[in-house]
Curated annotation (Swiss-Prot):
Name listed for the protein in its UniProt record: UPF0398 protein SpyM3_1388
HAMAP family: UPF0398 (MF_01575)
UniProt cross-references to PANTHER family, sorted A to Z: UPF0398 PROTEIN SPR0331 (PTHR38440:SF1), UPF0398 PROTEIN YPSA (PTHR38440)
NCBIfam families: PRK13660.1
Organism placement in taxonomy: Bacteria, Bacillati, Bacillota, Bacilli, Lactobacillales
Family under the similarity heading: Belongs to the UPF0398 family.
Amino acid sequence: MTAILITGYRSFEIGIFDHKDPRVSIIKQAIRKDLIGYLENGVDWFIFTGNLGFEQWALEVANELKEEYPLQIATIFLFETHGDKWNEKNQEVLSQFRAVDFVKYYFPNYEQPTQFSQYYQFLLEKTEGAYVFYDTENETNLKYFLKKAKDMPYYQLLLLTFDRLNDMSQS
C-alpha cells in the first residue's frame, strides 16, 4: 500500500471565493495530471485533512479518477468538530470529505496547541509522501508541516507552485 497526503492552500488564502473562478479549472488540470502520475506509479490511497480549497478540488478530481483507477480515499480530520460552524454550502463539501472510503477523527476536540504537531507527525508517519499546493512566496502555516516533511528521510514531496500553474496555463 502506498499512501499520499494531499494538502495545500485553502481557497481564501489564494483569493478564490467562487468555485467558478477560472483559476480553479487550471488548478484542477494540474491536480489531474499529478494524481494520474501518482496512480501510474503505484499509489493506491489519497489522504485528505478535509480543508476547503486545494483539498476540495483534489477530492473532486480523485473521485472522478475512481472511475478509471483502483484507488482509495481517506479523510483524517484533526478534530471531530471540524467544519461544524461552516455555512450550508461548505457543509456540502464537508459531507463529500465524509463520504470517502475511510474517515478518522484524530482528536475529539481541541484541548492544547501540541495537538497540531502530533496530528502532522501522525500524517507523516502514515504516508509515504505528500502532494502540496504551496509556494514559499506565499507562506502559511503549512510551512511547519513542510519543514517536518523535509526532515524525514525518504519522504517524497511534490509541490504544486504558482510557477508550475503559470506554465500549465500558458500551454
